[in-house]
From Swiss-Prot:
Monomer. Binds 1 zinc ion per subunit. The gene is mutM. This is Formamidopyrimidine-DNA glycosylase. The active site is at residues 2-3, 60, 264. It comes from Oceanobacillus iheyensis (strain DSM 14371 / CIP 107618 / JCM 11309 / KCTC 3954 / HTE831).
């Protein structure tokens, strides 16, 4: 699933191609993707004739700011946007096409068909699902140490599980949680209530640094992620633990191990991230 750095990269590349383009009409081949309004014809009517004025992002969600509305798009597992000229071959699994008045087309392709789209009036986008259920973005000023520490100390969950909770902080997924925990020298099975304020500060700082580094590298391509121009991310070359099972740690040389935390595959260095609680 594209996480914050991948969605940020997609947002920035989309800005180059879709801003100030007017949507002439829309084809929707998989209506189940349209979540609000749930009537596809109403969805089309709201968006048709609107010009894309700017692009935004909240966590893993793309935000298309139109004249009067905001189109909220979640790529889920395999969703991809690409811009095409008229007559370009249409790939299999292209489920939504936005036709611009200049003849260009913005196509949404999704092998798994898990992606979602919502439309709300500008100013109401954070009042409804899905955005109203999200915690702060890691780059929001509201994601400060006091907020983060208060949230974590109130729960006895494993820190790995808490960092994946989008209501605490939004945008982190399995890749960047594992990398953040490694950089902060925190074991994924440590209970949140047992974290010191200094450990929480290290998590906050390293989450931001990890995400910034990944954004600079264009995201991480593990399986199929590419940006709007079809370019792969490069951050997979800089991963310390994720996907590095049995390889030597780049910091200490110990073998990276893989465990399960809350049903999620989790990578760590047992030396750099000691399990001081002895939890299995």
């Amino acid at each position: 699933m594209p996480e914050l750095p991948e969605v940020e990269t997609i947002k920035e590349t989309l800005k180059l191609f879709v801003c100030n383009k007017t949507i002439k009409h829309i084809d929707i081949e998989w209506p189940n993707m349209i979540k609000h309004p749930d009537d596809v014809e109403e969805f089309k009517a709201l968006v048709t004739g609107q010009t894309i004025r700017s692009m935004g992002r909240k966590g893993k969600f793309l935000l298309f700011y139109l004249d009067e509305y905001v189109l909220i798009s979640h790529l889920r597992m395999e969703g991809k946007y690409s811009v095409h000229s008229p007559g370009d071959p249409v790939k299999k699994h292209t489920h939504v096409t936005f036709y611009f008045s200049n003849g260009e087309e913005l196509r949404y392709n999704d092998v798994r068909k898990f992606g979602t789209m919502h439309v709300y009036p500008i100013g109401e986008e954070f009042m409804h699902k899905p955005l109203n259920q999200l915690g702060p973005d890691p780059f929001d000023t509201s994601f400060n140490l006091e907020y983060f520490y208060e949230k974590l100390k109130r729960t006895d969950r494993y820190i790995k599980t808490a960092l994946l909770d989008q209501s605490i902080v939004t945008g982190l997924g399995n890749i960047y949680v594992d990398e953040t925990l490694f950089r902060a020298n925190v074991h994924p099975l440590k209970r949140c209530s047992k974290l010191s304020k200094q450990e929480v500060k290290k998590l906050q700082i390293n989450a931001k640094e990890t995400l910034r580094d990944a954004i600079k590298a264009g995201g991480t391509t593990i399986r199929s992620y590419v940006n709007t121009q079809g370019d792969m991310g490069m951050f997979q070359q800089d991963l310390y633990v994720y996907g590095q099972h049995s390889k030597p740690c780049r910091v200490c040389g110990a073998d990276i191990i893989k465990i399960k935390v809350g049903g999620r595959g989790t990578h760590l260095c047992p030396t750099c991230q000691p399990n001081k609680q002895g939890v299995r």
